[in-house]
Design a protein with these regions (language model features):
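Sec-dependent bacterial lipoprotein signal peptides
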Residues: 1-21
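Membrane-proximal, proline-rich intrinsically disordered regions
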Residues: 23-81, 110, 125, 459, ...
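Short capping/connector residues at structural and topological boundaries
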Residues: 35, 42, 158-160, 255, ...
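Beta-strand acidic-aromatic groove motif in beta-rich domains, primarily in extracellular
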Residues: 65-74, 152-153, 238, 451
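Short coil/turn segments at secondary-structure boundaries
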Residues: 68-72, 298-300, 446-455
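Structured, solvent-exposed acidic/aromatic patches
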Residues: 82-138, 142-383, 420-432, 437, ...
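C-terminal functional modules
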Residues: 386-530
């Protein structure tokens, strides 16, 4: 932060000296405050647009600690099998399907409000096509997480309205619009890959102005979103995924998308406050596989074991939970992961499994695992990929209250069909392998893990022991979405009621209805039983 301040002090001094040297102009120029940067000077430095660009980047994976906690640690993280709460005074929480009114607003209203001020400032305040492309891309990166969490959301009407209390779009309409915006951004970025990095570097905490890398991220995001539609709109999913792959996705860890903030504030959440510990689910899988990445990602508990907290329990002692369950490894200089090469390669593997070559799918699957090992600095990927004996471990609660048998018997090595009769079953098991390994590789992206769990049914997760939903959630299937904030009922009720009707109309293969956590969103339609 001090470096940035010094840089701007130099800029301001230069501009002030420039103003003093040019004081022979008209009266306005003579009387201008020479220590103040003008609009023209800020435009020349890309300052006004650049600061809004930084603001949008800070929301893709929220860097503000409270916003991060509500979006990832308290909702997406638990539902994705990554994180469980240790606080013994939280009796109303997402994990037990009874979040308080205050909790419900954070992943929805707070994200939307924070996004649209800088977004509109760019699209309405500049004619720079690259800046507008960045704004469109980042809005999609932020808002696809919101629609994936809720279903129908306000989207198309927000750009032209001052109020955030507007009509909702169906999730299908949101995805359609987002693909249009991604395609527009990809086309513009593709024409500007030789733009000097200096044009954006001071405002870019991800790729430091490298447009070619941003293009890979945009195509990777398109691939993620395309595969999200694999069950609800298979033809669209296949076409959009093919376009993304052809356009060039992230294939090397050097191109991973991660936000380098001045400080990673999740250290407060996990290290200082101790409000959360690693979830039992991910450590059951990794313990069972004797996964070498485990010690690179997590800390052992007070007796040297890697063991997670069961998600959705009634915690009786925070201090005991903090010591008995493993924490994640995070430091103040840890970047906020957005998208890594392993995820893009696993998505490509699934594309090949569904619509291409099974042999290519196998190659990509193994390549993705190796990329993840490389990213974590772990060795032993080759041995890991051929060990057909190890399976996910049962859960043994160090406090003795919530132990459970393993939910899956999936092994790591790719499986080849031995005859035509078992092709479909083998393909499904290989899909489970892809999703489980991707789940391990993208930690701690909780919202994404939860979305893929809902889409595919994998990884198979432990049910919550404490269900306070009043029957509005099928505990075996887990939470399918988040409920809308109370403020929407109070300030935007007519539009909200229409959205709830749309939510129900879009649902397929669901067994709950209405604005509850058990209702399925549009793309969550796989008819599976856990």
């Amino acid at each position: 932060m001090k470096k940035m301040n010094n840089r701007w002090q130099s800029v301001l001094l230069s501009l002030a000296l420039f103003g003093l040297a040019a004081c022979t102009g008209d009266f306005e120029d003579i009387n201008r405050n020479t220590n103040q940067v003008t609009d023209d000077q800020m435009d020349a430095l890309n300052y006004k647009t650049g600061t809004k660009f930084k603001a949008l980047q800070s929301l893709v994976i929220p860097v503000q600690e409270h916003m991060y906690q509500f979006n990832e640690s308290l909702s997406g993280g638990p539902f994705g099998g990554y994180i469980g709460a240790t606080v013994d005074t939280w009796q109303t929480k997402f994990e037990t399907y009874n979040p308080s009114a205050d909790w419900r607003k954070w992943p929805f209203a707070n994200v939307i409000t924070e996004t649209y001020t800088p977004y509109k400032g760019i699209v309405n305040g500049t004619e720079d096509e690259v800046a507008i492309a960045f704004a469109r891309l980042l809005r999609v990166a932020i808002m696809h997480r919101v629609t994936d969490s809720y279903g129908p959301i306000p989207y198309s009407k927000l750009e032209s309205n001052e109020s955030v209390y507007v009509e909702y779009d169906s999730q299908e309409a949101v995805y359609t619009k987002m693909f249009e915006e991604l395609d527009e951004a990809i086309e513009i970025l593709g024409r500007n890959t030789t733009l000097p990095a200096e044009a954006w570097s001071r405002y870019d905490g991800v790729y430091y102005g490298n447009i070619a890398q941003w293009l890979k991220y945009a195509n990777s995001l398109k691939l993620r979103m395309a595969m999200r539609l694999s069950y609800v709109k298979s033809d669209v999913a296949r076409a959009k995924a093919a376009e993304a792959i052809a356009g060039g996705v992230i294939e090397a860890n050097a191109d991973n998308a991660a936000m380098h903030a001045a400080e990673n504030r999740t250290t407060l959440i996990y290290n200082d406050w101790g409000d959360h510990r690693v979830g039992a689910d991910i450590l059951c899988y990794m313990n069972g596989y004797k996964d070498p990445r485990m010690e690179k990602m997590f800390l052992a508990n007070d007796v040297g074991d890697y063991v997670g907290i069961r998600i959705g329990i009634d915690v009786t002692s925070k201090s005991q939970a903090m010591s008995k369950y493993s924490n994640m490894i995070v430091a103040s200089d840890t970047p906020y992961l957005w998208f890594n090469a392993a995820e893009a390669t696993f998505l490509h593997a699934e594309y090949e499994l569904r619509w291409g070559s099974a042999e290519t799918a196998k190659t990509l699957y193994e390549q993705a695992v190796r990329l993840s090992f490389e990213e974590r600095g772990a060795s032993g990927a080759d041995a890991y990929l051929v060990d057909a004996t190890k399976k996910p471990a049962p859960y043994t609660d160090p406090l003795g209250n919530y132990s459970a048998s393993a939910r899956s018997e999936i092994t790591v090595p790719w499986e080849t069909a031995t005859d035509g009769s078992d092709t479909e079953a083998v393909q499904e098991r290989n899909l489970e392998r892809i999703i489980v390994q991707k789940w391990i590789a993208i930690f701690p992206l909780g919202v994404e893990a939860w979305s893929e769990h809902r889409r595919t049914g994998y990884p198979k997760l432990l049910p919550v022991p404490t269900d306070k939903s009043g029957g509005s959630v099928n505990v075996e299937q887990g939470a399918r979405r988040l409920p809308y904030p109370v403020e929407e009922y109070q300030q935007n009720n007519a539009n909200l009621q229409a959205a709830i009707q749309t939510l129900g109309a879009e649902q397929q293969n669901g067994d709950r209805s209405g604005d509850v956590m058990g209702t399925r969103v549009w793309w969550d339609c796989k008819p599976y039983n856990k």
